[in-house]
Regions:
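Bacterial Sec-dependent N-terminal signal peptides
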Residues: 1-24
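Divalent metal-dependent phosphoesterase catalytic cores across multiple superfamilies
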Residues: 21-166
Length: 166
């Protein structure tokens, strides 16, 4: 009986371990790169997985789909995904989510910039690769929570303005 219980428990825990290894998670949630009035690149990192799909549209119902690729990071199981969205309209709000196999993100939004000749006011925030600085481990949190968010609240109240591209 003890052998049977041990065999069952060993099988159960091996199964849980294998399932955990096969379940992808976001290492880095979706972020935007190289925005211009008619295209933008969406990137994200997962613990594993090949599929690189972005569903997008001008409403949260989405409706369009773009496919990209994924590459290994340092020859490990993590994958960085890249999908370019093209044919976008300038100065337009888009909604999107990313998919890698069974892993699906929340729905996010961004606004494409205007053409320079449009003479439209356009705000943006640029941040560099925020590597962990062991001398200042809370710097990114400080920049966002003590700088950017209080500024937006003082300028626009409790809502982010529509003309602020994210």
């Amino acid at each position: 009986m003890k052998l049977l219980n041990f065999t069952f428990l060993a099988t159960y825990f091996c199964g849980v371990a294998l399932y955990a290894q096969e379940t992808s998670v976001f290492v880095v949630k979706p972020y935007l790169q190289d925005a211009n009035p008619t295209e933008i690149t969406v990137m994200w990192e997962t613990s594993l997985g090949e599929e690189s799909v972005v569903e997008f549209g001008t409403s949260p119902k989405l409706g369009k789909k773009a496919v990209g690729g994924a590459e290994d990071i340092n020859f490990g199981p993590s994958r960085i995904h890249e999908v370019k969205l093209t044919g976008l309209k300038r100065f337009t709000t888009y909604y999107y989510r990313v998919k890698t196999d069974k892993l699906v993100s929340d729905i996010y939004q961004f606004k494409t910039p205007p053409f320079a000749s449009d003479n439209e006011s356009f705000n943006f925030l640029a941040m560099s690769d925020m590597q962990i600085d062991h001398q200042n481990p809370d710097k990114f949190n400080e920049i966002v929570n003590k700088g950017i968010l209080p500024f937006l609240k003082s300028e626009y109240g409790n809502t982010t303005p529509d003309d602020l591209a994210m």
